[in-house]
Regions:
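Long, intrinsically disordered, low-complexity segments
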Residues: 25-29, 52, 94-97, 162-164, ...
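Sec-dependent bacterial lipoprotein signal peptides
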Residues: 2-24, 214
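Polar, glycine-rich mid-to-C-terminal structural blocks
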Residues: 226, 269-298
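C-terminal substrate/ligand-recognition segments
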Residues: 296-358
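Acidic, glycine-rich segments characteristic of secretory precursors and extracytoplasmic regions
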Residues: 2, 26-65, 81, 88, ...
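Conserved, well-structured interaction surfaces
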Residues: 70-142, 166-206, 315-328, 333, ...
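Short coil/turn linking the two alpha-helices of tandem helical-hairpin repeats
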Residues: 139-141, 146, 198, 224-233, ...
Length: 442
C-alpha cells in the first residue's frame, strides 16, 4: 500500500503526537549549569553570547565518552549491554544538549523585547536546528526516544494532546517514525531563517549552522527515510516502506520568499518521493556553491571567539579561529555527491556523473555506479565520518558486515540495528521502555 507522508509544517507533527507526553525534565539534566540567563539582558550580541554560543562550545566537546563518534564505530558493538557506560554517556550528552537548546529558546523568549522580530526568528531558528541535529543523532542510535521541548512549545502541544503534567514531569518515548517527522519538519521550518552563507566561510557565521548544513541533514534524512519510517526493526527490514512510496512536501521555490518581501506565488511546494527529496536537497547544496575543492560543509570542532558586534560585521580578521582534532559532526560534499548518486540509482536513474566526480577527485578511474560500488567507496572515502554503521543498515549489510569480528557478527540480531536504552535512564524514568530484544539484559 502506498504510504503518503506529507512533511511540511509543525501542525502536521502535532497530529502525530496526540498521545505523546512532552515535558522538559526527562533525564534529570541541568542545562542551567552551562547556560546562565542572568547576564542576557543587554544587546542582541550579548543575548547571542549567552544563548547560542554555548551550544556550539558544548557540541564541539572532545572529552572521552562525550558525544557519539565512539559508539558509531563497528568495534563498539562488542558491548551492547544496557549497562554499558559509553551508551549512557552518549545518551546523557545528547539530552543535555537538547535541554540546553530548550533553555536557550526560553531565554530568547524572555529577552525578546530586546530583539527585533527578525533577530528573534533567526536566533530561535539556529537553536532549533542544533536541537534537531541532536535529535537526529539520538534517533539514529536509540530508535524510540522522548521528545523534550521548550516551555512555550510545551504549552502549545500539551493541550493538543490532552496530557497533564505529572509530579515527576517525565516524558514517554515516541515511535521512531514520529521522531523522524518531527526532525524533518523542524529543519524545513527553520531553513528560511538561517543565513545562506557557508558555515566554513570566515566571518560571523563561521562554524555555525547555516542553510547548507540544514540542506545536508535533510538530504541525509531523506536517504535513510526507509529505515527511520519503519518502527518494527526487530523483525528485520524486509517489510520496510519503499522510498518511492514515501512522499515529502518540499518547497521548490525560494523558501525565504515571503520573509524577504517576495510574492506568495514564489513560495511553491511540490510532492517528491524519498529519493527525489534527497536529490533535491543535494542539488540545493550545489546551488549554494558547495564543491569537492572545498569539501567540508560543517565541522563542529571549529572554535571561534565572537566579537561583541559580531551580528553587525563580517570582517574575517575580527574573529579568532581554532580547531581541536576530534569533531563530533563533520559533513562533506563528497558525502553529498555519493548520496545523490545512490538516490538516483535507487530511483531508477543514472548516478554515474556524481559518482565518478568523486572518484576522479580521488584520482580513481571511472566505473559503474552500482549500489554495491557506491557502498564500497563510501566505506573508503568516508572512513573518518560516523556514517558507516548507518550505511550498512540502509544497504541491508549490517548484520553480515565483514568489518565485524566473527564472534560479534554471530551475536547480532535485527534488534542490534539500534542500541539499547541505557539502564540508568530506564531506572530514572519509569515511562521509558527498553528496545525490543534487549529486555532480557536488564
Amino acid at each position: 500500500m502506498v504510504m503518503r507522508r506529507y512533511i511540511s509544517h509543525l501542525f502536521t507533527w502535532v497530529i502525530s503526537f496526540l498521545t505523546l507526553l512532552v515535558f522538559s525534565s526527562c533525564l534529570n539534566e541541568h542545562p542551567k549549569d552551562q547556560l546562565d540567563g542572568g547576564g542576557s539582558n543587554g544587546s542582541a550580541s550579548e543575548i547571542f553570547d549567552t544563548t547560542i554560543a554555548p551550544l556550539y562550545d558544548f557540541m564541539g566537546g572532545t572529552i572521552d565518552g562525550e558525544g557519539i563518534r565512539d559508539i558509531q564505530r563497528l568495534d563498539s558493538l562488542l558491548s551492547l549491554s544496557p549497562d554499558d557506560e559509553q551508551l549512557y554517556s552518549s545518551w546523557q550528552y545528547l539530552y543535555r544538549a537538547i535541554g540546553m537548546c530548550n533553555k536557550s529558546l526560553d531565554m530568547i523568549d524572555l529577552q525578546s523585547v530586546r530583539l527585533t522580530d527578525n533577530q528573534k526568528a533567526q536566533f530561535k531558528a539556529e537553536v532549533r536546528a542544533i536541537r534537531a541535529m541532536m535529535y537526529y543523532e539520538a534517533m539514529d542510535l536509540y530508535g524510540r526516544i522522548p521528545v523534550l521541548l521548550s516551555s512555550a512549545e510545551s504549552l502549545i502541544y500539551e493541550p493538543a494532546s490532552g496530557s497533564s503534567v505529572t509530579d515527576e514531569k517525565l516524558s514517554a518515548q515516541s515511535e521512531r517514525s514520529e521522531i523522524f517527522h518531527f526532525i524533518f519538519s523542524e529543519l524545513q521550518q527553520v531553513l528560511p531563517y538561517l543565513p545562506q552563507t557557508s558555515s566554513l566561510e570566515e566571518g560571523s557565521h563561521y562554524g555555525r549552522i547555516t542553510q547548507p548544513v540544514v540542506n545536508f541533514l535533510l538530504a541525509k534524512l531523506a536517504l535513510n527515510a526507509e529505515i527511520y519510517m519503519y518502527n518494527d526493526w526487530a523483525q528485520g527490514y524486509r517489510k520496510r516502506p519503499k522510498g518511492r512510496d514515501l512522499e515529502f512536501m518540499v518547497r521548490t521555490a525560494d523558501g525565504a520568499s515571503l520573509i524577504t518581501g517576495g510574492k506568495a506565488s514564489e513560495n511553491r511546494s511540490k510532492i517528491l518521493n524519498a529519493w527525489e527529496t534527497c536529490i533535491f536537497y543535494c542539488n540545493r547544496l550545489a546551488d549554494e556553491g558547495c564543491s569537492l575543492e572545498e569539501d567540508e560543509i560543517f565541522n563542529s570542532s571549529v572554535r571561534y571567539q565572537m566579537p561583541k558586534d559580531a551580528l553587525l560585521m563580517d570582517e574575517a580578521d575580527s574573529v579568532q579561529y581554532s580547531r581541536p582534532a576530534k569533531p563530533l559532526f563533520r559533513f562533506r560534499y563528497t558525502d553529498v555527491l555519493l548520496m545523490k548518486a545512490e538516490a538516483m540509482e535507487r530511483n531508477d536513474g543514472d548516478g554515474r556523473a556524481e559518482y565518478n566526480m568523486v572518484r576522479a577527485h580521488a584520482g580513481l578511474p571511472a566505473r559503474k555506479s552500482s549500489l554495491a560500488n557506491i557502498l564500497e567507496d563510501r566505506q573508503v572515502m568516508l572512513a573518518g565520518e560516523t556514517c558507516h554503521r548507518q550505511d550498512l543498515i540502509r544497504f541491508g549489510k549490517f548484520l553480515k558486515s565483514s568489518h565485524l569480528r566473527r564472534s560479534v557478527q554471530s551475536a547480532l540480531t535485527s534488534c542490534s540495528i539500534v542500541f539499547p536504552i541505557p539502564q540508568r535512564s530506564l531506572a530514572f524514568n519509569g515511562k521509558l521502555v527498553q528496545n525490543k530484544g534487549y529486555e532480557a539484559m536488564e
